[in-house]
Amino acid sequence: MSSPEEMPHVRKLFEEYAASLDIDLCFQDFERELETLPGGYGPPDGIIIVAFSDGEAAGCVALRRLESKVCEMKRLYVKPEHRGKGIGRALAGAVIERAREIGYASMKLDTLRSMTEANALYVSLGFTECAAYCHNPCECPVYMELSLI
């Protein structure tokens, strides 16, 4: 769980995540999200988790409320030099567990078809494709959902 002292790490990881994409996140009001961290990812309805490896912020994931019993996983990102160590799976597992503790019944996420490694991770965690639940103007978005009960 992120502390106020970790917000600079979170901001940097979020910026690296955005830069790694072939899209502009302006449709998600990404700049405002950065300016207001933790924003909707703050307690009691959300969380940001940062993973450290050898003292360095290696990755992150965030959770926010969509509806009464529905949450959304956002910003799952692991720095390239830390990939292949299970950090992404550990982050996803931790945020899923926290969502259950908060009392959410389901978790959603949106991703891109081109993010094949991330999509394989989500499927291995039990996510299945679902109907669109948010605006995503990108080519080939994928919407997924996981039952938490």
Predicted regions and their residues:
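Active-site acidic-Proline motif in GNAT/NAT acetyltransferases
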Residues: 79-85, 113-114
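Alpha-helical macromolecular-interaction surfaces
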Residues: 86, 90, 94, 116-117
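C-terminal "cap" of GNAT-fold acetyltransferases
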Residues: 105-108, 112-149
